[in-house]
Amino acid sequence: MIKNREKDFKHNGVKVLRSSHRDIRRLKNIYKPALHGFRVWPSSWLLIDYFMRSRLKPNSRIVEVGCGWGIAGISCVKNFNSVVTCVDSDSAVFPYVNLHAKINDVTVTTVQSDFNDLCENNMKNMEIMIGSDICF
């Protein structure tokens, strides 16, 4: 992890803004995630490290459930050219996902849905389902 004084850091090539970064503070004044999507959880780093070591198949179609800020999915796009759909029950997390996608120069799709409401239609084109820190 490379840290600097600009309130951001990189993890395996993915730029992440800290909660104290002015853009995150601005979003927090407008969008207030109701569940646990108010920060990046450490389990995201573990999942990203696993993908980097296991060499995730390039161009995979991935759904990230309980995405929060979407950092694991963004890492898959950035490092493996994956096509990622970020799913969360709390739509207030999507501005954070979109900001991180923008600063990493990648594109992800966002879908507001509870995990229990996902159905075959949502998953028919997906190859891999990922999630970190989603069992609480």
Predicted regions: what they are:
Residues 1-136:
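S-adenosylmethionine-dependent methyltransferases
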